[in-house]
Amino acid sequence: QSLDGCIAREDGESHWISGQEDLDHTHRLRALCDAVLVGAGTVIKDDCRLTVRRCEGQNPLRVVLDPNASVPTESALFSDATAPTLWITGSTGADPGQPLGENVDILKLPCEGGRFALDRVLSALADRGVRRLFVEGGGFTITRFLKAGLMDRLHIAMAPIFMGSGRSSTQEALGQSLADCPRPQVSVYPMGGD
């Protein structure tokens, strides 16, 4: 993210705010987890593959939270068969209009107000053997996990850039007052220019 807390410009441009060393680190984190999870907005915006390509390691299960089944079926996550994908959609959402690859499973879970109960998501992932989950993005999804107190560790890459305005790394208030806001212990590690 930028020094002023943005993960994208207002027009959505985000490639690349941080440097190559941070991208390498992201791939290492993917290689260390059982599953990598993103929200539908990240897939729609970035058409990401969420695979391990910049280091050695196994590809994790790719998980997409998509209450409205809005991710296009031509997305890389569904057409790239190098890793398994779990597409979590709302229980009342539409089924995809075309068949998906053998690497894609669809799990329908109930939604309330367009949101999944994260404890149900985590339980479903645990049933599939997921013990180490990397919540990679985007801002809305990470904010939900933070608010629910479901993050053990948070990696934030701060790039030496000011954007002035743009999409914030968190999408909702994390407390009713400053006293309620999370104040985690912090460690700082330089990664190239970030």
Regions picked out by a protein language model, each given a short descriptive name:
Residues 1-194:
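Enzymes that bind and transform nitrogen-containing heteroaromatic metabolites
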